[in-house]
């Protein structure tokens, strides 16, 4: 592969939306991981990552703010392998902070690759992780005779990797008929645990799903899309069923337009079904879904959608709008578009590795941070990994989904969640901290009011207020580092008491 240093570059169409719409809760980060059959060696993984970055220099970028758009700039930062230490799919991009937009971590037998969607899409992430796993296994087992193999074309260049395929296939003349957006059913459940992301995974047999799909005369994606809509329908009341269930289903555009780009290059379709006005049987939902996919998944319609998205971005007046104004408009548009879909279903398809590397790998998996309920899946060999992610206090829909699968003759096996304890305070700890903060503010306010009204000769009120503020700041810093309020409040309280005693002695 030709290795020419990457240069600064413009964001692709999807990346421009992600850079503006991401926030602390909706991080636009997704995780692709590989579970091995052996414990991960961090030193070997670091060496493998260093080699992988040589293959994909386009990933060594930081996000910068320009006058009109964000852009990516090469940097001298290098990724450091860490043991997993935080909630999956946590924020990677922090505004005005120079950080890489991806991270490689490990936990026991699992290697995680997390990436901000600005940098790449699912296909790009798959290629990066495959290269990383290949390099790791080669370094770990080359003494056993494992051979080094190339996964990418030898003649692939950096320019190929950073090619903006959206622009490449944009046509001014291509137009898509406008569709009226539906007022869709929205899942509304009380969120728990401080709005943390919840991940629930299961594994099924690829052959079992393919066998049943073929018996029904549909693809695996169509079969599972219909089941997902049925599972959601079972949780809807009679009133709620007046609104359609609409899924967002991402589509890899490389299947329609040749591209070796590592940038975002995907589209989506939105199959929707109204369970009040349409037949509620599975056969009817499956028939509708099949017809919808056949109608929408055409090169002409994908091309028209690309042109529609690019036409807005390239509008001469909108291009001149300052970045901050664009960000506000994109954020408002993203918030509005959330109402157009009920949930998200993303099929990352099969991950293939060289035959000699297969015995060392258990499975691959993928999931993403999302404000909605999302089902992601990918397969390796005969293991199809499902991952439901949400921030809702319910697992009923996924329970329904797996029950419906079982009714189709497909059994699933739950994956026991294995995550290190997240470095975040619990809901109870946050409540205690908020009460503590309120009391500190109340004391400071009382001291200031007392000082203003009584004007004591010795300004003990101001010293007390200052001591409380100091104690609160020190306690807060310690709390968000260690999440133990009593332990972190003790030292400031002692310091404040000593200071107060010294002052009185004077």
Regions found by a protein language model. Give the residues of each.
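Non-catalytic, low-complexity flexible loops and terminal extensions
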Residues: 2-13, 110, 119-127, 131-211, ...
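Acyl-thioester-dependent acyl-group transfer interface
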Residues: 1-67, 76-103, 234-423
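Acyl activation and transfer enzymes in specialized metabolism, enriched
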Residues: 37-54, 114-130, 199-238, 386-388, ...
């Amino acid at each position: 592969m030709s290795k020419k240093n990457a240069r600064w570059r413009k964001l692709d169409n999807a990346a421009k939306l992600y850079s503006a719409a991401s926030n602390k809760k909706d991080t636009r980060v997704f995780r692709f991981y590989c579970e091995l059959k052996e414990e991960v060696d961090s030193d070997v993984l670091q060496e493998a990552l260093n080699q992988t970055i040589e293959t994909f220099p386009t990933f060594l970028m930081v996000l910068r703010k320009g006058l009109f758009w964000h852009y990516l700039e090469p940097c001298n930062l290098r990724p450091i392998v860490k043991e997993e230490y935080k909630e999956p799919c946590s924020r990677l991009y922090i505004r005005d902070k120079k950080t890489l937009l991806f991270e490689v971590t490990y936990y026991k037998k699992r290697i995680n690759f997390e990436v901000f969607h600005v940098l790449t899409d699912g296909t790009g992430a798959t290629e990066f992780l495959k290269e990383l796993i290949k390099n790791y296994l080669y370094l770990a087992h080359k003494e056993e005779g494992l051979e080094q193999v190339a996964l990418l074309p030898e003649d692939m260049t950096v320019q190929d990797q950073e090619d903006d395929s959206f622009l490449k296939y944009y046509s001014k003349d291509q137009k898509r008929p406008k569709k009226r957006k539906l007022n869709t059913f929205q899942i509304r459940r009380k969120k728990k645990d401080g709005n943390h992301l919840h991940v629930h995974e299961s594994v099924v047999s690829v052959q079992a799903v393919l066998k049943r799909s073929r018996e029904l005369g549909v693809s695996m994606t169509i079969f599972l899309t219909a089941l997902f809509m049925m599972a959601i329908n079972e949780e809807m009341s009679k009133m709620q069923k007046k609104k359609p269930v609409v899924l967002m289903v991402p589509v890899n555009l490389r299947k329609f337009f040749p591209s070796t780009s590592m940038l975002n290059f995907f589209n989506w379709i939105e199959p929707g079904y109204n369970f009040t006005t349409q037949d509620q049987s599975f056969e009817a939902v499956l028939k509708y879904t099949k017809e919808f996919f056949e109608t929408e998944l055409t090169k002409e319609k994908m091309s028209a959608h690309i042109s529609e998205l690019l036409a807005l971005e390239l509008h001469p007046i909108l291009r001149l709008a300052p970045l901050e104004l664009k960000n506000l408009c994109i954020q408002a548009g993203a918030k509005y578009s959330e109402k157009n879909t009920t949930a998200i279903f993303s099929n990352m398809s099969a991950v293939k590795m060289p035959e000699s590397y297969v015995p060392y790998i258990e499975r691959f998996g993928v999931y993403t941070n999302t404000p909605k309920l999302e089902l992601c899946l990918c397969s390796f060999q005969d293991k199809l990994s499902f991952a439901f992610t949400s921030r809702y206090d319910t697992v009923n829909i996924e329970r329904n989904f797996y029950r419906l699968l079982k009714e189709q003759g497909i059994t699933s096996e739950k994956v026991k969640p294995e995550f290190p304890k997240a470095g975040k305070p619990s809901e109870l700890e946050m409540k205690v901290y908020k009460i503590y903060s309120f009391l500190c503010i109340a004391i400071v306010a009382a001291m200031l009011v007392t000082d203003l009204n009584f004007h004591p000769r010795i300004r003990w009120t101001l010293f007390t207020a200052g001591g409380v503020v100091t104690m609160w700041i020190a306690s807060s810093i310690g709390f968000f580092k260690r999440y133990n309020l009593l332990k972190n409040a003790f030292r400031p309280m002692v310091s404040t008491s000593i200071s107060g005693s010294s002052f009185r002695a004077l």
